[in-house]
UniProtKB/Swiss-Prot annotation:
This is Uncharacterized protein C1834.10c. One of its GO terms (biological process) is mitochondrial proton-transporting ATP synthase complex assembly. It comes from the Eukaryota. One of its GO terms (cellular component) is mitochondrion. It holds the Pfam family TMEM70.
Length: 178
């Protein structure tokens, strides 16, 4: 089998009268790392803000209050900025995706590193033009508010193929219209 083990593509036909269903499952290789980075980042942000008053109150080797205030300001600004950048870059990262029929379920991480589920029908998703797209995203919703997602292209081929197929205009068979 040429496909990676992270993707399970299966077509199931059960013995009873159940219908044929096609399912694609995507499991991101970096989901644990991204989740841990987000949790560490928000933890360090909280710790920085909790310890800031202590840094102001302690007399640290003759440093003036202005110097201590600028150190606290710099620490809080740096931690806030790094947490914001990590969240912005990783909020589109899809940790798990499941395609069942015409519905794609996507799990991403919120700012706290907890899973966030989004579900879309395939006609509400599009593969954007790479020149005009948001960085760190290769899939976007067409609904408002617009959401962006990143799936590893080499691991999510069945999902991208299904979206491309859903984007193609439907052809009307002339024999059916009579």
């Amino acid at each position: 089998m040429n496909m990676p083990s992270e993707i399970l593509l299966g077509a199931r036909r059960w013995f009873a009268s159940t219908s044929f269903s096609l399912a694609a499952v995507y499991d991101a290789p970096l989901k644990k790392a991204i989740g841990n980075i987000k949790k560490f980042s928000i933890g360090s942000l909280g710790l920085t803000y909790m310890i800031s008053p202590v840094m102001l109150l302690l007399d640290a080797g003759g440093l003036s209050l202005g110097t201590r205030m600028s150190m606290v300001f710099l620490a809080c600004t740096t931690t806030s900025l790094s947490t914001a950048i990590i969240h912005w870059a990783a909020k589109s990262y899809v940790s798990e995706a499941t395609l069942k029929g015409n519905v794609l379920s996507l799990n991403t991480f919120n700012i706290l590193g907890k899973k966030r589920l989004s579900q879309y029908t395939l006609d509400k998703l599009k593969i954007p033009d790479t020149n005009n797209s948001r960085p760190f995203a290769n899939l976007e919703s067409t609904t408002v508010p617009k959401r962006y997602f990143y799936l590893h292209p080499e691991l999510a081929t069945p999902i991208f193929n299904a979206i491309r197929q859903a984007q193609q205009p439907k052809q009307i068979n002339k024999n059916d219209s009579k």
